[in-house]
Amino acid sequence: MQDIYDLLSEGERVTLECKKATKGVPNSLWDTYSAFANTYGGTILLGVVEHMDEQNNTKRFEIVGVEDADKIRKDLWNTVNSREKVNINLLYDDDIQTIDIDGKKIIAINVPRADYTVRPVYINNNLSRGT
C-alpha cells in the first residue's frame, strides 16, 4: 500500500499513468501501453483518479477502486493477447497485480520497455497509431 502512495507522491509522469477504470478497461489504456513499451516502460494504475486542479500531489490522486477486479484482469489478458488490439504481449503474470487499499481494489500494470527487436509496439493493426 505504501508503495502506491510513494508512486503517486511524485505525480503522473513519463512512467506513470492513472486511469479511473471503475467499470472496465478503458480504451486509452492501450495507447499508454504502447507508449510505455516504446520508451522507458512504466506503471498504469487502474482505479485511481487524478484531480488536475489540485496542486498538492498528496491530494491530487483519489483511490476510487475498480468494481470487478477479476473481470478487468481477465479482459486485460484477453485483449493484450489479441493481435487485433496490440501487436505483442510484453506482460507476465507478475506484471498485473490487484492491490487492496482501504477496502478498494486497484490494478497495477507494470509495462516493461520492449526490446529493440520487437519495437515498435503498436495498436489496432496500425503501425502509425499508438507508437
Positions of the model-derived regions?
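Conserved N-terminal catalytic/coupling substructures associated with nucleotide/phosphate chemistry
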Residues: 1-131
